[in-house]
């Protein structure tokens, strides 16, 4: 009878002869790690393993904050440790210098390895805390993100804001131009003023072609000549109204009407013989009625004031004069 336990080697013996899996790798994995590509499946598996499987010793000088060359150096040391059979003794001899999970180049602060690891988390490196903060706006109530929307023209000269061209330029453009409706007062020279005054004495209301011709002759704009005539007529009308009111007239005589759209007030205050006859109709009737009716039959009839007046000036008593002449003719024929 044979006892299998006696012939079979103990269970722990093959494990002593067999190399540790963490120390030696198959030929395929060794060729994979020998390459520099970091996108292979083996590299991703090695990176995703817990730190206890890939714990390796590093010198004390490497405990300083990791730099840009640290991941490459750690990767090279890791491959050399995995390939060397004596790395286990070094790992066992220096447990204090073992790399903590927080200092791994691929360590995630909120990853599964960080949550399940029993090692205390390291605080943020003082060198990282001493990094200069991002530059913000000079004023305490504005952050750096609002700086492009603020121009230096809205703040005093002591502000350190650099003006950005093309940012909200419409308020500045509108501020420099005069508002619509505010026209600058034109300054006329003596020659221009004399020419305008001479033309105004000839005609108070200048026509559009004459106005354009006068503007081109004097080197002015058509609107300037138009406004000058408007202001001059208003000044002239006010002076004539004062003269008319002082002489006992009414203001309506100076205003334009449908029959006389352009009243001429140059003769205000100066009454001619026709005006005296209109003011005294009794004298006009006495002037037309002769003392002897026979003289009317022998001689021609005198002209009526309506016919003697100028044709350009309308007379308010033209209808009444014609009626009175008809009555006088009837009386003359009857007598």
UniProtKB/Swiss-Prot annotation:
Q: Which keywords does the record carry?
A: Developmental protein, DNA-binding, Homeobox, Nucleus
InterPro entries to which the protein is assigned, alphabetical: H2.0_Homeobox_NeuralPatt, HD, HD_metazoa, Homeobox_CS, Homeodomain-like_sf, HTH_motif
CDD domains membership:
homeodomain (cd00086)
Region ranges (Disordered): 58-102, 240-335
GO MF, one term, reads: DNA binding
Please give an example of a GO cellular component term from this record: nucleus
- Name a Pfam family for this protein: Homeodomain
Outline what the protein does.
Could have a role in patterning the central nervous system during embryogenesis. Has a key role in regulating the distinct phenotypic features that distinguish two major classes of ventral interneurons, V0 and V1 neurons. Regulates the transcription factor profile, neurotransmitter phenotype, intraspinal migratory path and axonal trajectory of V0 neurons, features that differentiate them from an adjacent set of V1 neurons.
Q: What is this protein called?
A: Homeobox protein DBX1
Annotated organism of origin = Mus musculus
Q: What is the lineage of its organism?
A: Eukaryota, Metazoa, Chordata, Craniata, Vertebrata
Q: Which gene encodes it?
A: Dbx1
């Amino acid at each position: 009878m044979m006892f299998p336990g006696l012939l079979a080697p103990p269970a722990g013996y093959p494990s002593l002869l067999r190399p540790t899996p963490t120390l030696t790798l198959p030929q395929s994995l060794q060729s994979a790690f020998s390459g520099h590509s970091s996108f292979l499946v083996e590299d991703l598996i090695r990176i995703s393993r817990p730190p206890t499987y890939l714990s390796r010793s590093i010198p004390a000088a490497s405990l300083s904050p990791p730099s840009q060359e640290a991941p490459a150096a750690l990767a090279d040391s890791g491959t050399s440790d995995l390939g060397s059979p004596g790395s286990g003794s070094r790992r066992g001899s220096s447990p204090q210098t073992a790399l903590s999970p927080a200092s791994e180049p691929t360590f995630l602060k909120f990853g599964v390895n960080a949550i399940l690891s029993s090692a205390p988390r390291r605080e943020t490196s003082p060198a990282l805390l001493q990094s200069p903060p991002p530059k913000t706006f000079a004023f305490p109530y504005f952050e750096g993100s609002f700086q492009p929307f603020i121009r230096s023209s809205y703040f005093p000269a002591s502000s350190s804001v650099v003006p950005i061209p093309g940012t909200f330029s419409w308020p500045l453009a509108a501020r420099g131009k005069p508002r619509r409706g505010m026209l600058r007062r034109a300054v006329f020279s003596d020659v221009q003023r004399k020419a305008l005054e001479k033309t105004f004495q000839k005609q108070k209301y200048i026509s559009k072609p004459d106005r354009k011709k006068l503007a081109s002759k004097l080197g002015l704009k058509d609107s300037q000549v138009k406004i000058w005539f408007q202001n001059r007529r208003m000044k002239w009308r006010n002076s004539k109204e004062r003269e008319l009111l002082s002489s006992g007239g009414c203001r309506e005589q100076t205003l334009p009407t449908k029959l006389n759209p352009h009243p001429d007030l140059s003769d205000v205050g100066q009454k001619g013989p026709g005006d005296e006859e209109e003011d005294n109709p009794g004298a006009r009737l006495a002037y037309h009625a002769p003392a002897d009716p026979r003289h009317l039959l022998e001689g021609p009839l005198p002209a009526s004031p309506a016919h003697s007046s100028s044709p350009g000036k309308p007379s308010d008593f033209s209808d009444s004069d014609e009626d009175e002449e008809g009555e006088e003719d009837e009386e003359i024929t009857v007598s």
